[in-house]
Amino acid sequence: MMRSHYCGALNRSHIGQQVILSGWVHKRRDLGGLIFIDMRDREGIVQVCFDPKYQEALTEASALRNEFCIKIEGEVIARPDNQINKNMATGEVEVVAKALSVYNVSDVLPLDFNQNNTEEQRLKYRYLDLRRPEMAQHLKTRAKITAFVRRYMDENGFLDIETPMLTKATPEGARDYLVPSRVHKGKFYALPQSPQLFKQLLMMSGFDRYYQIVKCFRDEDLRADRQPEFTQIDVETSFMTAPEVREIMEKMVHGLWLNTIGVDLGKFPTMTWQEAMERFGSDKPDLRNPLEIVDVADIVKDIDFNVFSDPANSSNGRVAVIRVPNGINITRKQIDEYTQFVGIYGAKGLAWVKINDINAGLEGVQSPIAKFLTTEKIKAIFDRTSAQSDDILFFGADKWQTATDAMGALRLKLGRDLGLTHLDEWKPLWVIDFPMFERDEEGNLAAMHHPFTSPKDFTPEQLEANPTSAVANAYDMVINGYEVGGGSVRIFDPKMQQTVFHILGIDEDQQREKFGFLLDALKFGTPPHAGLAFGLDRLTMLLTGTDNIRDVIAFPKTTAAACLMTDAPSLANEKALEELAIKVTRSE
């Protein structure tokens, strides 16, 4: 027998028991006549004592070094009161070793568990990095999350159904990973960016509650929180309204937080996309931050200051204010830094007003724009923003999107810098009623979610006539400023689906080529259906308290989409390429 108990599971209830432990030497201390080691496995660490009473084990222990893989047979005893370690889960007990076996020795590690290693080192020697207790804990939490999700979905009548990994390329906003076919030379499969169409087809097949914990692939430029392969908790339902879908998924996430970290998230408020953008400058607002954005275009539209009056009088402009309570001590240097910061988002500047005395009107403020304002105007701004003495007001004025993005980013930065964001709180919400379409960089209409999202209360004819005023029957779940899941009611009318394709510039020939199977399926009594998908990696990040998505994936890629451990991607051998009828052009 190699193991009777896990190291990290031992406690006072095991005192007097004989145990067999298998794991690694975490630390070793030689005190002359006694040797102590901290022994580690996936459940934690326990102190093992080698005593002269068991001389053979003590002699063998003198050769132990960090990360040797060993087996201990011994007895659990209570630690003396003055040696209890309250920082360890097993700190009230230790194991007296009666026998020691070494499964395997270890070279000196290229990582140091007691100090910060570079990201490159950690990813190159990932199998060693995962031995660190905090990393093991992340993956155990991830396993706990998926176990809870499977249990919840099963209890609520959802069927776990797999969908294909080798599929057809579809335009979903990012580039596909392509897989060449050896049998069909010159043709390619695509790895799925999501199981979207297959789960809709499952609804058409009569499986009215589907879920899957599934790998998805996107060949996009990576950011810190993106990976080329990621995992979704994918869900689809038939005969359920959007509020019903949100309710059953909210209950799942509520239970997940309670089960994993013992936190009651309470009832999730619902907010429209328009309100989220206007008040918080983001479609994924972090409600732990009390700062809000307030519109003042109507107040400043006729002042003699073009920076404000031009956007205030434009249908596509915005003049907005953030009030920072007690922000009067923000220095000019800090204001200059914030001005530079909003420039990243396209803002041309950042006006400000410091309020020394709210009752003194213009005499009571300090501001480079005071000369353009009247007493009536400044009072109206004070009233609109609920300003007080000792506050500072920051103004953004530009095109609506630029001003909204810049002020939204500034709001988050101010919340962090000034300690206003309540980092110990959980603030979930649903964001609903997104625009159906948005303009891409070329000015063409693109689906804000995806082309299979249904509009709210629009006929195909109304949508064709006025696509930019359509609201999507879509919803995102947001927790602490992170979008953890998103979904929508799907189009189940073939005419509506063709109308959306047409608005997106997909002509009938392209529709048949890319989505013929879907358009055909929609003709055969398709039920109303809706669903959503959660990012498992993002959920795990939140529940483990890490801000690095790579910490919650066992073997992640770098931001350059490479695996430093296996050296993937790599060159293919010529014979394999020949069989695939592929010729690679090498860059010079």
UniProtKB/Swiss-Prot annotation:
Listed InterPro entries: Aa-tRNA-synt_II, aa-tRNA-synth_II, aa-tRNA-synth_II/BPL/LPL, Asp-tRNA-ligase_1, Asp-tRNA-ligase_1_N, Asp/Asn-tRNA-synth_IIb, AspRS_core, GAD-like_sf
PROSITE patterns on file: AA_TRNA_LIGASE_II (PS50862)
Gene3D superfamilies assigned to the protein according to its UniProt record, in alphabetical order: Bira Bifunctional Protein, Domain 2, GAD-like domain, Nucleic acid-binding proteins
Group of enzyme by EC: ligase
Presence of the UniProt keyword Protein biosynthesis in the record: yes
GO cellular component: cytoplasm
Location within or outside the cell: Cytoplasm
HAMAP family on file: Asp_tRNA_synth_type1
EC id: 6.1.1.12
UniProt similarity note: Belongs to the class-II aminoacyl-tRNA synthetase family. Type 1 subfamily.
Subunit structure: Homodimer.
Species of provenance: Histophilus somni (strain 2336)
Function: Catalyzes the attachment of L-aspartate to tRNA(Asp) in a two-step reaction: L-aspartate is first activated by ATP to form Asp-AMP and then transferred to the acceptor end of tRNA(Asp).
Residues holding L-aspartate: 172, 218, 449, 490
SUPFAM superfamilies to which the protein is assigned, alphabetical: Class II aaRS and biotin synthetases, GAD domain-like, Nucleic acid-binding proteins
Pfam families: GAD, tRNA-synt_2, tRNA_anti-codon
Protein name, as recorded: Aspartate--tRNA ligase
Annotated residues for binding of ATP: 218-220, 227, 483, 535-538
GO biological process, any: aspartyl-tRNA aminoacylation
